[in-house]
């Protein structure tokens, strides 16, 4: 959608730096957006924002999952991007993207993959996703870049990984659901997630043949303490209620500190 947006003779802004469309992954229809970092560092321009809004509306019409492949430095701030006093991130354009993500919530699944940096207003996109994958060493998500932090506060940070890298979001902010070693593994995880979830809120999730739980299902009360303030291992009751073929648990992306 919008392949020829911002097309020019010198082809400065092909597709306005954003690909959108509808395709299939293992037979499942999915709507997607993908930033093109080779065009203005994946920044969001006027036409790019319009393309996002259109594909979001199409996903809602079709009731299909929304896949966000993010590699962006945020909103494009060039003077030529707007009229005097106007902005493409207001409530009817850029703000509409986030409104649509709120409307999607609970209706169609939203899966995000950070294949690179995600800075400023664009950093809200993955936060709204239901399931967020970050990739070791290349993902990053911050409201302000290291350069802006240095300019505004005088504080030096070594780079995106220190300021908003995957380790920070997996261990401290809790924004990342899983941290994976490379882009190929991230793509495989997207396929696995799609296999295990329904297309939308009105469909039942995929089913598999039932099997007994790995532990005695008759005794969950034996592993849950009577005192509501006492901590316990949550895996113990789960093992007594859920059979092994159920969706895998989300392992801790980063081991907890000692």
Task: Name these PLM-found stretches.
Residues 1, 30-39, 77-80, 150, ...:
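Gly-rich Lys/Arg/Thr-decorated short loops/hinges at beta-loop-alpha junctions or inter-strand turns
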Residues 2-31, 60, 226-258:
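Non-catalytic terminal/interface segments that mediate subunit docking, oligomerization
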Residues 7, 16-18, 51-55, 97, ...:
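Short alpha-helical segments and helix-capping/turn motifs at coil-helix boundaries
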Residues 12-16, 40-57:
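Glycine-rich anion/phosphate-binding loops
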Residues 23-36, 51-81, 258:
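A structural preference for short, pocket-lining loop segments at secondary-structure junctions
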Residues 38-47, 80-88:
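Flexible beta-alpha connector loops of hexameric P-loop NTPases
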Residues 70-202:
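Conserved catalytic cores of soluble enzyme domains
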Residues 178-235:
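Terminal amphipathic helices with adjacent charged low-complexity linkers/tails
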